[in-house]
């Protein structure tokens, strides 16, 4: 299926006249429509809520849009908690997942009244100590089933190799201890596959977690308030990939819910999700201008963006589709490596990619950068992070994060006598 950018050459030029490339641009209309589609897919569950994974796109303007669409925030660090709080998310608007968590972070989550998702059974005492002997009324526990996680004959991931979560026996012990300390309600959380467009993933994960909830309820007598399916629902980065069908996924989870939980009298359990990539990736582009061309053993196109603006291709070998704006319908009769300017040979957005003829000054849109794009940026080689722009529903645009300046790069030397220009 052809991938079409949500921004035109004319609009990109209009933005570029005020905000130089490279910049990340986000599609407000697409974000809102997708959030509503997710909500509709799980409307059968009265307590359903999406907790957007802040790490995917940590920008308060994006979080505010999602808040308006009924989403909470999934946080995993002190600063992510501060950002969630800045847009008015407190209490059970926030899910905090522990993971080698510093005391400062855990205490902040507790003080905010967030749902706390414990990664390990030893964290029960850690939490109790931080809470001065108290514990929250509701606590979530992260599950790791071990072994491999499969759909049919296809192995999706290897939980046994993951650092996250606890065993079923450890969960039972943690529940018993927490009940003695005063916890009254529990949640279950698990993340067993990443970026899968297989529509059967969530239903299979749900089936495993629903059955686990029944076993743990029977073993401990506890009450489960929610089950958090976390993330993992992917997007179609490549044109030939199938897209996730969220309506079909939601229906699959509903069927498992009614087969497993309802007969057990556990049909008051809310379903939560923590989708980052699915919620935002398709609704972000990295917009960049062609600076140079090089003709040696391959044809190279050099952009003003680099891996510091989008790490995924360099780090994971990930595919991101590229559109030369204004040439959407041109013949793909040239083959290029599309590169950035870092002093690293893996700073390539595409390798031997078929594209239309490219000229210096062309503007390109690198697709699906709305999640894990800007957020994974860095300052290697002294590169400065790019701006973020919101393309609003009325086709106007708004700067939602300015580009870094040299003064930002040097800011942490403010205690010294060095003086930096720029």
Which sequence ranges carry the predicted segments?
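Conserved, mostly hydrophobic/aromatic
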Residues: 31, 55, 77, 109, ...
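Structured core elements
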Residues: 72, 95, 117, 140-142, ...
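Glycine-rich, aromatic-flanked loop segments that form ligand/cofactor-binding clefts
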Residues: 134-148
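A charged N-terminal "starter" segment
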Residues: 1-137, 176, 180, 184, ...
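Active-site loop/helix belt of alpha/beta enzymes
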Residues: 145-291, 355
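Charged (often Lys/Glu-rich) extended helix/loop segments that serve as interaction or gating elements
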Residues: 266-422
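Short acidic, glycine/serine/threonine-rich loops at helix termini
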Residues: 63, 86, 106-110, 127-130, ...
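Flexible loop/turn segments at secondary-structure boundaries
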Residues: 58-61, 82-83, 102, 148-149, ...
């Amino acid at each position: 299926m052809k991938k079409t950018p949500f921004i035109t050459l004319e609009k990109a030029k209009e933005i570029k006249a005020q905000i130089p490339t490279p910049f990340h641009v986000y599609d407000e209309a697409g974000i809102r429509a997708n959030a509503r589609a997710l909500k509709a897919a799980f409307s059968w569950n009265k307590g359903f809520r999406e907790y957007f994974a802040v790490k995917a796109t940590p920008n308060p303007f994006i979080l505010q849009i999602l808040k308006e669409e009924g989403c909470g925030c999934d946080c995993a660090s002190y600063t992510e908690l501060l950002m969630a709080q800045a847009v008015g998310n407190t209490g059970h608007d926030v899910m905090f997942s522990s993971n080698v968590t510093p005391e400062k972070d855990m205490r902040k989550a507790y003080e905010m009244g967030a749902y706390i998702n414990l990664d390990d059974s030893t964290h029960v005492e850690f939490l109790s100590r931080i809470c001065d002997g108290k514990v929250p009324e509701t606590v979530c526990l992260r599950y790791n089933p071990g072994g491999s996680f499969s759909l049919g004959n296809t192995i999706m991931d290897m939980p046994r190799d993951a650092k996250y979560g606890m065993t079923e026996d450890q969960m039972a012990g943690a529940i018993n201890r927490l009940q003695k300390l005063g916890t009254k309600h529990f949640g279950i959380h698990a993340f067993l596959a990443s970026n899968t467009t297989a529509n059967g993933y969530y239903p299979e994960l749900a089936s495993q977690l629903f059955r686990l909830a029944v076993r743990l309820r029977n073993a401990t007598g506890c009450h489960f308030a929610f089950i958090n399916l976390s993330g993992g629902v992917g997007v179609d980065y490549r044109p030939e990939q199938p897209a996730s069908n969220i309506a079909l996924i939601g229906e699959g989870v509903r069927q498992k819910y009614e087969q497993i939980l309802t007969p057990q009298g556990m049909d008051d359990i809310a379903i939560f999700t923590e989708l980052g990539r699915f919620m935002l990736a398709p609704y972000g582009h990295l917009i960049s201008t062609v600076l140079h061309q090089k003709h040696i053993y391959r044809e190279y196109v050099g952009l003003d963006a680099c891996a510091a603006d989008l790490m995924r291709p360099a780090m994971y070998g990930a595919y991101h589709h590229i559109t030369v704006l204004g040439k959407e319908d041109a013949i793909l009769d040239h083959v290029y490596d599309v590169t950035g300017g870092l002093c690293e040979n893996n700073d390539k957005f595409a390798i031997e990619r078929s594209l239309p003829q490219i000229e210096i000054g062309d503007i390109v849109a690198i697709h699906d950068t709305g999640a894990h794009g800007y957020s994974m940026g860095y300052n290697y080689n002294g590169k400065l992070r790019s701006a973020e722009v919101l393309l609003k529903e009325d086709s106007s645009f708004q700067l939602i994060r300015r580009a870094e300046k040299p003064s930002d790069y040097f800011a942490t030397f403010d205690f010294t006598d060095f003086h930096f220009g720029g």
